[in-house]
């Protein structure tokens, strides 16, 4: 179009877009600031946080640590697990539809590697992975709104992603619907994981991660809740 300044128009549109985005961000932050603050209870699986009884949204603060811990994967067999909160799976996060979630991810100084978190309950690419990629000794904080009810996985998305997940960096986030959930007698939190060790099944001593077994999809262990016998014997789940 003759006489039309496309560059100026583009700059004006960009400025309007930036202003709208800034205004929206400020508005969301202001609304969240007015909500009651609740610190998420995190418990070791197979336990999980209690059902939500409140009828209104809240600002839920989740303090999650990344811990690289050596412990038994089977009797006499040890393994270096990479975990959220020191457990496999990582401790369940439980929020309500409409909640604003403020997630603090701390990578302990004793760890050796960078890690992050990708929550599939988060809208947008990466699920928070880009905002939370941190080296040992650092902490990242990001905020999101729980928009859609459902049960979602979360996991570390640091490359190589498969290795971080196979070493135990996965868990669940439950977004309860606004109307709540049906009452049940008991709730348990169970996830299956594949583990790939250099030694054979139940080979004694400290076993390392075997990348070739992982590539070939030939796990040494297929476990519930990260350990051989985690849900049997004295750890059996009761009805």
Functional labels for PLM-detected ranges:
Residues 53-55, 88-101, 232-239:
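Short, glycine/small-residue-enriched coil/turn segments at secondary-structure junctions
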Residues 54, 174-191, 199:
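Low-complexity, Pro/Ser/Thr- and charge-rich linker/hinge segments at domain boundaries
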Residues 21, 26-33:
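Boundary at the C-terminal end of the N-terminal hydrophobic targeting segment
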Residues 2-12:
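Bacterial N-terminal signal peptides that target proteins for export
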Residues 61-175:
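Histidine- and aromatic-enriched segments that form or immediately flank copper-ligand environments
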Residues 186-238:
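Acidic-aromatic/histidine active-site loop/patch
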Residues 10-24:
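Bacterial N-terminal signal peptides
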